[in-house]
Curated annotation (Swiss-Prot):
Location of this chain's protein in the cell: Cell inner membrane
Gene Ontology MF: a single term: ATP binding
Gene Ontology cellular component annotations, sorted alphabetically: plasma membrane; proton-transporting ATP synthase complex
Record protein name field: ATP synthase epsilon chain
Topological relation to the membrane, as annotated: Peripheral membrane protein
Subunit (UniProt): F-type ATPases have 2 components, CF(1) - the catalytic core - and CF(0) - the membrane proton channel. CF(1) has five subunits: alpha(3), beta(3), gamma(1), delta(1), epsilon(1). CF(0) has three main subunits: a, b and c.
Pfam families: ATP-synt_DE, ATP-synt_DE_N
Task of the protein: Produces ATP from ADP in the presence of a proton gradient across the membrane.
Family: Belongs to the ATPase epsilon chain family.
Organism for this UniProt entry: Wigglesworthia glossinidia brevipalpis
Keyword Membrane set for record: yes
Keyword Nucleotide-binding: no
């Protein structure tokens, strides 16, 4: 492998999602957005609900929704272990819109702090799914 690309693997609890050489990826880490290029310093961090934007070695763009998990970078090998990962083209937009509406309603109705926090997490996941869906279909 040369220094223009690195191996990226995305695995969810349910499925093997992606494995290929890539030029670049961007992912939502616990401390903010991470841009990953070949030769990135070793790192292990939590990832928040959001997306990973991938540019393959053949300049093909792909977006994958991630519900959270762990990111490991080590010697031009990047591994994402996600709780849930869904390719953008596989996301049901109508379901995501419905999930967003339900979460918004739960936020308004929540009486306990833990209910509110759970609803906010569900809202962030639904918004991330919608974003991935829109980016994948443009």
């Amino acid at each position: 492998m040369n220094n223009k690309f690195y191996q990226l693997t995305v695995i969810s609890a349910e499925n093997f999602i992606f494995s290929n050489l890539v030029k670049k990826s961007n992912i939502t880490g616990s401390e903010g957005n991470l841009g990953i290029l070949p030769g990135h310093a070793p790192l292990i961090t939590k990832i928040k609900p959001g997306l990973i934007h991938i540019i393959s070695s053949k300049n093909i763009e792909e977006y994958i929704y991630l519900s959270g998990g762990i990111l490991e970078i080590n010697s031009n090998v990047v591994t994402v272990l996600a709780d849930t990962a869904i390719r953008g083209k596989e996301i049901d937009e109508k379901k995501a819109i419905e999930s967003k509406k339900n979460a918004e309603e739960l936020i308004l109705k929540s009486k306990e702090r833990h209910e509110y926090i759970r609803a906010v997490i569900e809202l962030s996941k639904a918004i991330a799914k919608l974003r991935v869906c829109k980016l994948s279909n443009k």
